Amino acid sequence: MVLVVGAAIVRDGALLAARRTTPAATAGRWELPGGKVDAGETAEAALVREIAEELGCQVRVERWLEGEQPIDGVHVLRAAHCSLSGGEPRPGSDHDELRWLGPDRLDEVDWLEPDRPFLPGLRALLLGS
């Protein structure tokens, strides 16, 4: 299986959601931004690298969320609660919009299926922050 990592970036009681532009099958849907872990790379290093590449900011992994979610027959998603440690997130080539969503607004966007199982725990995290 190929590990994909997603960043649940939290700031001021809100979660950052990113709307995909590619591929066509996922364009217009929302996700926790991130990407694939390269050979020889740790999951944490991959997440920090992917967020810098995709959003132009730096994050710090606070803790990994429980569970892994299958994406397809080849990829599996792990997600981490992250905080911003530098810069301001900006959409890059993979995303056309970013939104900060409070716990009562998490259902306002059309999340990709692998991200959905993480939402109840993230809602609880936001309510406690």
Question: Residue spans of the language-model regions?
Answer:
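Conserved N-terminal beta-strand and adjoining loop/helix that marks the start
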Residues: 1-16, 36
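Generic C-terminal helix-cap and adjacent flexible tail
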Residues: 123-129
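Conserved Nudix-box catalytic region and its N-terminal flanking loop in Nudix hydrolases
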Residues: 14-53, 57
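Active-site-adjacent beta-strand/loop module that shapes the phosphate/pyrophosphate-binding cleft
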Residues: 58, 66-90, 99, 103, ...
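HhH-family (HhH-GPD) DNA N-glycosylase catalytic core used in base-excision repair
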Residues: 52, 58, 62, 127
